């Protein structure tokens, strides 16, 4: 297991958050390309709907990170009643530190962007599981199964 990289990013309300703010809790940290796009909205709403179940199983918090602005995150969170922190990383430093920034292909075009990755971080700040290139529709249910397995240990 490797140590989760620390960060200092603003949430959708302009509050500065770091890894220490979530210390002692399991963290479901997911990286997504862009607010208010079909796949990202589906993923965020699935996490919203699963959050209570995620918290009951392990007490985990959900944190979403993209390079969108604080204002964009605020509108996105309000529009979809998102009940977790969305952190803004416009310079993609944290996104890069977690390995979620890199080359992508879309409609025959190559560019650099955010990979739809999720990291499960232990209360001790260790990355215990990586989900790379997740399917936004099926990801939350898989995560709940994995958290339930961890809770049994």
Residue ranges and their predicted role:
Residues 1-153:
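Chalcogenol-based redox active-site neighborhoods
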């Amino acid at each position: 297991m490797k140590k989760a990289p620390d960060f200092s990013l603003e949430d959708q309300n302009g509050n500065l958050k770091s890894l220490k703010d979530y210390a002692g809790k399991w963290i479901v940290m997911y990286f997504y390309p862009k607010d208010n796009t079909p796949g990202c909205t589906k993923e965020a709403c699935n996490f919203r709907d699963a959050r209570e179940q995620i918290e009951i199983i392990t007490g985990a918090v959900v944190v979403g990170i993209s390079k969108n602005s604080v204002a964009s995150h605020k509108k996105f969170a309000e529009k979809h009643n998102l009940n977790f922190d969305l952190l803004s990383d416009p310079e993609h430093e944290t996104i890069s530190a977690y390995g979620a920034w890199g080359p992508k292909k879309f409609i025959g075009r190559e560019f650099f962007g955010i990979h739809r990755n999720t990291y499960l971080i232990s209360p001790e700040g260790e990355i215990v599981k990586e989900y790379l290139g997740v399917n936004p529709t099926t990801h939350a249910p898989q995560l709940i199964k994995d958290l339930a397995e961890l809770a049994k240990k």
